[in-house]
Swiss-Prot record:
This is Protein TusB. Part of a sulfur-relay system required for 2-thiolation of 5-methylaminomethyl-2-thiouridine (mnm(5)s(2)U) at tRNA wobble positions. Heterohexamer, formed by a dimer of trimers. The hexameric TusBCD complex contains 2 copies each of TusB, TusC and TusD. The TusBCD complex interacts with TusE. HAMAP family: Thiourid_synth_B. It comes from Photorhabdus laumondii subsp. laumondii (strain DSM 15139 / CIP 105565 / TT01). NCBIfam families: PRK13510.1 (NF010035), sulf_tusB_dsrH (TIGR03011). Keywords: Cytoplasm, tRNA processing. GO terms for biological process: tRNA wobble position uridine thiolation. The lineage of its organism: Bacteria, Pseudomonadati, Pseudomonadota, Gammaproteobacteria, Enterobacterales. Its main location: cytoplasm. It is found in: Cytoplasm. Belongs to the DsrH/TusB family.
Length: 95
């Protein structure tokens, strides 16, 4: 399943998200959700331990000036990669 997270980690329940995740799932941080991909974020380690792949949209990272702060555990992707993730997953959930 593809989970798109568009809200700040401080505005949504990441404890619930981490309980839903399984290996093979992908999480894409978009909009203010890219804040969850910052190195040292308290929510990031819980998401990493779930085994899901983590992605963040490059344009949203750049728009917030976070280019050098994204964890190396989060793969930065562009809109073409975003489309490829949506094609890969028949089921999607937006947070």
């Amino acid at each position: 399943m593809l989970y798109t997270v568009g809200r700040s980690p401080y505005q949504c329940d990441f404890n619930v998200i981490s309980k839903l995740l399984a290996r093979g799932d992908d999480i894409l941080f978009i909009q203010d959700g890219v804040l969850a991909g910052i190195e040292g974020n308290c929510y990031l380690s819980a998401l990493i331990s779930c085994g899901a792949a983590l992605y963040a949209l490059k344009e949203d990272i750049e728009a917030r000036g976070l280019d050098d702060q994204v964890s190396d555990k989060v793969q930065v992707i562009d809109y073409t990669d975003f489309v490829n993730l949506t094609v890969k997953h028949h089921q999607q959930f937006a947070w």
